[in-house]
Amino acid sequence: MKQLRWKYDYHSNPKEVNKHWHILCGHNKEECDTAGYDWADEMFDLFKTKFGFKDKYMVEDYVRIYCNAHTHGLEPHMHTDDGDFTMIYYPRLDWKSDAWGGGTLIDGQLVPYKGNRLVVFDAYLDHKAMPVSRECYELRNVVVFKCNVKDANHERLDFYKEN
């Protein structure tokens, strides 16, 4: 993940001003492969099989995969996501959560950043990345999988789009 070409100027909530580092991997296998992020599509397939996404969540595929990153001084905003489920993977095995912070606040509950952890939650829940300590000189990065339930009624998503 350290070798990726990050772009700054992305915000999780268009109504807010704070931005963070971001990479769009793709909306499907072909886009991920073409852009050089085949590993992201393979990661999703591994998680899908290992954790039984189809049986547990009725999820067969992703809508998009992207990577987000934060450094000290970036203050993330609370937001909700489009889609049915958001899945956040913490890849950094060397992350020192107690000293550096950088977890995720989901519906008022802090989920500490722990390397090789996959967090799955309803996309409509308020959430945000937590700030990174000024004692941290590392990039707090995550891989995010946005997913919809197969054949779901997505009427509730209109509420998100209007607000």
PLM segments and residue spans:
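Alpha-helix C-terminal capping segments
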Residues: 51-57, 79-81, 103-106
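Glycine- and acidic-residue-biased ligand/ion/polar-headgroup-sensing regions
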Residues: 85, 91-94
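Short Gly/Ser/Thr- and Asp/Glu-enriched loop/turn motifs at secondary-structure junctions
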Residues: 60-64
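Conserved short histidine dyad/triad with adjacent acidic residue
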Residues: 65-82
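A composition/secondary-structure signal for short, hydrophobic, low-basic-content segments
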Residues: 16-18, 73-75, 123
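Non-heme Fe(II)/2-oxoglutarate
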Residues: 1-59, 163
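A generic structural micro-feature
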Residues: 79-85, 135-139
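Catalytic core of Fe(II)/2-oxoglutarate
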Residues: 67, 93, 97-163
